[in-house]
């Protein structure tokens, strides 16, 4: 069962397309819950329990995904957003924390959807309903991958709590 199912996922043959525009990066897309970050013009941003990634060069992210064979989606977001907007949104948070902030929080802020989304499927459904989702690229996907697995807020909070115990 999926919380969001993709119609068409294509291979990323030309990584240079990620150097322009905005992409939602879904790490461990087959797991519950997945982790998300944002790519803007070839730079990566993400909020994690251990802190945050800001302005990480895309080449480093792709190298990690390839080396660890991480099941990843890169979803083109057809909304005009600037690097400055993303930096401002991420500057408000130091790290993800159970019952307060998740990796979704600053991303929802960037797109002014904080009140409307509480999980990745909500964000994806919002983009899809407004025709703001472009190409969906897949890297290291499992053979039968079709979409984001069904999960709830409880799984997100449990994962954040488990990760915070490893600090």
Short names for language-model regions:
Residues 18-21, 84-90:
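Catalytic-site beta-strand/loop segments enriched in glycine and acidic/polar residues
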Residues 58, 83, 153-156:
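Short amphipathic alpha-helical segments that mediate assembly, nucleic-acid/protein binding
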Residues 2-71:
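Glycine-rich catalytic cores of cysteine/serine-nucleophile enzymes that process amide/ester linkages
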Residues 90-167:
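Activation targets extended, charge/polar-rich intrinsically disordered C-terminal tails
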Residues 47, 53-56, 77-81, 101, ...:
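Short coil/turn linker and secondary-structure boundary residues
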Residues 61, 65, 77-78, 163:
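Low-complexity, intrinsically disordered/propeptide-like segments
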Residues 68-87:
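A structural motif
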């Amino acid at each position: 069962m999926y919380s969001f199912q993709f119609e068409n996922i294509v291979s990323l043959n030309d990584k240079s397309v990620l150097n322009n525009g905005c992409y939602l990066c879904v790490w461990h897309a087959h797991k519950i819950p997945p982790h998300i970050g944002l790519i803007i013009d070839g730079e990566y941003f993400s909020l994690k329990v251990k802190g945050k990634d800001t302005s990480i060069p895309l080449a480093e992210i792709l190298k990690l995904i390839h080396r660890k064979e991480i099941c990843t989606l890169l979803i083109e977001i057809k909304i005009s957003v600037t690097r400055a907007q993303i930096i401002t949104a991420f500057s408000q948070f130091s790290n993800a924390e159970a019952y307060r902030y998740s990796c979704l929080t600053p991303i929802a802020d960037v797109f002014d959807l904080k009140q409307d989304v509480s999980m990745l499927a909500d964000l994806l459904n919002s983009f899809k309903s407004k025709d703001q989702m472009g190409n969906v690229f897949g890297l290291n996907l499992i053979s039968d991958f079709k979409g984001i697995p069904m999960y709830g807020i409880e799984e997100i909070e449990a994962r954040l709590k488990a990760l915070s115990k490893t600090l």
